Amino acid sequence: MKRTTIFALLIAMVFINTSCRENKEEPINNSVIPQGTVVDYMPKSSKRGVSFSFTNVMDLPLLSPYITWDYNWGNTPTNDAALWFDTNGMDFCPMCWNGNYSADRIRSFVAAHPNTKYLLAFNEPNLTDQANMTPAQAAALWPPIVALAKELNLKLISPAMNYGTLAGYSNPIKWLDEFFAQPGVSIDDVHAISIHCYMSSPSAVQDYVRMFRKYNKPVWLTEFCAWDPVPGNVEVQKDYMCSVLNFLESEALVERYAWFIPRSSASLDKAPYMQLLTHTNPPTLTPLGEMFCYLSPMDTTVWLDAKRTILASEYVKLKNTSMALRPSNDSVALASAGVPGLMITNFAAGQQLTYQLYTATQTKQLNLRYNGYSNSICELHVDGKLQNYIDMPRNGSSTEWVTASIPLELTPGCHTVMLALFSGSCSLSALELTK
């Protein structure tokens, strides 16, 4: 697996200073965008994580290249997982699930792993089968947790809230409001608000997340998947994942999120179809797991070096978060890109995809890899300006890919390239700049 490659500092500074700034003497389509970092491949998301125990060490290399954090509802991870996290750019978040946590175990873990950053508080206190606490009961247990976080220099995350079953406190906002109003408790105690959500409607998830803006804190969505109502098949879960991850990555309010759950005891063909890992030995990613790993981090601080083929899923911005993606079946594009990725299966009129690309030399042409059952026309915008239209005649297939080409002279440097489908619909696999 190729990992994200950042240019050496000196080279990066040269590229940024000479290629990613406006140059008044260059042609009209020269880069006029802010400074940034040129990379070979998209970095992994700083937000993406899982709620999982990682008891099988073979699961670690499957997910760790694509996630930055994990928690398992406990005070510590397994020893194998802790070692792997330390050497693979991940952090583990200890949790005080209820009042029966071990402060000494947390202290020992942080001492052995000084890069630990966060401490999670009570798990779903307004559910009777979870932490099961009224705001007053939780407040009585709160000061030692605040003190522990300060002692260990950890940022404290609020109790994880969901719609609950505790009498009088089904509404998570009501529980939190009363909790933060308790003697000895302050909103300033916490760095972020933790929430859980199992609504199957992506728009409902968005509304739920934004409901917690009132606290003026970052939001951590620490458990989620489509479960209520139960999805009818795995394709529904896949569509949900696309919409929700695109939202979570693009929403500034959201600082972190964790999928529930990479593997359960149920078979893969059982609802709610949310498993990322197979039950085989050795395990592999499920198609849903591939999507979770390969969906774009939408990182606008980096510019992809277009010396390779750019996969359609490597966008940094899109107009509609309901864009549907699936593991790519375009072997030619995948081989040319040198990285696993996804294809867009519902690129429809009105949709927009934005890419941040760097080219070291003057380009001559843009190629799009696509297929579909209708004739399509795509607008090409470069650095904020409409440049041309790309004809994409139907090829009558969902598995065979064809190429549409158009002249495109880009000066060396960083450029935003936006594809906006004007009419028709198609699947999109990749784009390529040629010299």
Each predicted region: which residue ranges?
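Bacterial N-terminal signal peptides
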Residues: 8-15
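Active-site clefts of carbohydrate-active enzymes
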Residues: 158, 164-167, 214-241, 259-278
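Aromatic-rich peripheral "rim/lid" segments of glycoside hydrolase catalytic domains that contact
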Residues: 91-93, 253, 260-313
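Active-site groove signature of glycoside hydrolases
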Residues: 113-135, 156-167, 188-197, 221, ...
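Extracytoplasmic
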Residues: 299-435
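Aromatic- and acid-rich polysaccharide-binding/catalytic face
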Residues: 94, 123, 173-211, 215-229, ...
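Bacterial Sec-dependent N-terminal signal peptides
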Residues: 16-42
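N-terminal carbohydrate-binding/catalytic regions of secreted carbohydrate-active enzymes
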Residues: 45-119
